[in-house]
Amino acid sequence: MNYKRENFDKVVRLADYITSTSDPKMKWMWGEALLGYALDELDRECGEEKYTPFLKSYCDYWAKVDPAVDQSDTAAPGLITYAMYKRTGDAECKRLTDKVLDYIRYEPRLYLDCLNHLGSSKKGKIYPKSVWIDSVMMFSVFTSLYASENADTELVDFAARQPKQYASMMLNEKEHLWAHSYWVKRGKAFPRRNIFWGRGNGWVIAAFPMILDNIGLDHKEAPEIIELYRKTSEALLGVMNDDYTFNTLLKHRSYRELSATALISAGWLHGIRCGYLNERFLEPAIKAFETCVEAMEESDDGIFMTEISGPTIPLPLLPKLGYKMIPLGKNWSYGVAALIFAAIEYKKWGSASSN
């Protein structure tokens, strides 16, 4: 396999298109948070600050509005505010970051060290108290990053315990795939009956190597995180489509979904680079990324990532039908973020393979 620079460049054009046509006053929400974090990581990989003005404008806007941080999804923007604080030293970026940290440190725990995913938000007061696998990306990645860079050993340990605790609640030990949530009152993962959401398993595969980067391989929790990552990767290899994509439901007939595909590609390439996976995963990882790029649409109207399922929750009633009924869209923020993460890892692989 050969590295094709045009694949990386196409994703960069997508990032440029989004930042040049979108209002930086994006939502204070998880999808926008991941997009902003991915843009800053893309800048870091390229040795640039191309997207800093866009992301700093986002922070400036929310510094005036003073957003609520009341759930994992509204803690995720700490990824942007912390990145911009490191870039600029701006006091308001630090204040917003500290607000997220206060939530992480002081929000009551729901089960073990884990928080109610929907927190004290309006949705959290209606939906059953539960831990969601989404939190591994929306909550644990930032926590591990901030803690490691600021020598906060207590917070590092807290973040490092999260993957094992999520596994105790949501990992199907027979299939080695992850349920979307764990309902605490029932004491069970939900949904059941081998309903495994593709993007949720993508969060795991993309986030675990990020967390390992942050806590370090000498941390006592690292070996178990790697083992969980490997077993789920093996399971995912067994449900991959012939075109190297993944469906929105991994073991049931459903449509192919490219945010999950991009997340898994990114996580596999990251894991191969760090030695967690062997070379057997390389071709599937590369082909998955290339398939996502091939599915992009580019014309005078713009450039778009396609086949991204809309925001998804584990519906209390008829959850399998609920996943299947979520419509596909283009350029959803979290889907673009996933593709950028994969493009970054693809570029790293290309650089390493050329040396």
Spans of features found by a protein language model:
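CBM-like carbohydrate-recognition segments
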Residues: 2-33, 40, 45, 49-50, ...
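Short, contiguous, pocket-lining structural segments
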Residues: 27, 131-135, 151, 158, ...
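A non-catalytic, amphipathic alpha-helix used as a structural packing/dimerization or gating element
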Residues: 13, 54-57, 99, 158-161, ...
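Inter-helical turn/loop segments and adjacent helix faces that build the functional surface
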Residues: 146-157, 211-223, 271-279
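Oxyanion-binding "anion nests"
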Residues: 203-251
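Extended ligand-binding groove/face enriched in aromatic
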Residues: 52-53, 64-185, 190-192, 298, ...
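Hydrophobic alpha-helical packing residues
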Residues: 18, 104, 166, 211, ...
